[in-house]
């Protein structure tokens, strides 16, 4: 097709020259004639070995004219340039999604075919991409070759290290177009966007409650199972979720690492600081659909809604009196 008369019988890739097909076949056979003298890693092609050697020498001769970033390989530079141009020339014929790199399209296509040709020899788990298998294997070996130069923390994957580094640099390159919130990771932005869309694709099979995030559903399911795997070493109290344990631990340590830049007030939890800052900004993003009243916090809106629904879930066991808010119940209890 298109003048490529030599086709690989393994994957269907076409080549103009027979010699290139022969070289390509070594990928499938695993043949490695070219060995790195530094680390012993084997390669099927001399050119790939030469490129690999730059990881040891630190040589990065290819520079981006847009931002000045240096690269060891010209192909890596060309891929990087699409960040600046926004070019996405590779389209999925199934769903129309566009990609900057052909490799990303090939990987994406496996989501439609369900193909997972790479298998872990330790546990039998299957993967669509070889890179995912390589990363997964480190869970068995415990290997963490990527070290943060700032704090010394080790990571199994380079991408995890790069994400971690943003904690030190404060870099948040991903911005929500709806509200302007910034995020260090693209996945965090995608999760956040579901707040605006109201999308809740994860449903509890026990009670039907829907969740925006899979992790939230997993945490919720423990309510039904009664599972509380996270224990406080200080007092022995058990928790369903790790985050709940971490929040609880601040009671023992008294730690308040999150400080308001406006008034200096300290908070044990980042979420509480975020809510507090709305006092200074006057932001009230949560609106009552019944009367239009606005609130700074979602919990305040939920409490307010009980006025309209006349819901009174808090009952005093001594006299049977009901209240819509727990603070009102607490005030009443002082009378008795």
UniProtKB/Swiss-Prot annotation:
Major location category of this protein: nucleus
Keywords in alphabetical order: DNA-binding, Metal-binding, Nucleus, Repeat, Transcription, Transcription regulation, Zinc, Zinc-finger
Alphabetical GO biological process terms: negative regulation of transcription by RNA polymerase II; regulation of cytokine production; regulation of immune system process
One GO CC annotation: nucleoplasm
Zinc finger (C2H2-type) residue numbers: 6-28, 34-56, 62-84, 90-112, 118-140, 146-168, 174-196, 202-224, 230-252, 258-280, 286-308
MF GO annotations: DNA-binding transcription repressor activity, RNA polymerase II-specific; RNA polymerase II cis-regulatory region sequence-specific DNA binding; zinc ion binding
Cell location: Nucleus
InterPro entries in alphabetical order: Znf_C2H2_sf, Znf_C2H2_type
Pfam families to which the protein is assigned, alphabetical: zf-C2H2
Function: May be involved in transcriptional regulation.
Family to which this protein belongs: Belongs to the krueppel C2H2-type zinc-finger protein family.
The protein, known as: Gastrula zinc finger protein XlCGF57.1
Species whose genome carries this gene: Xenopus laevis (African clawed frog)
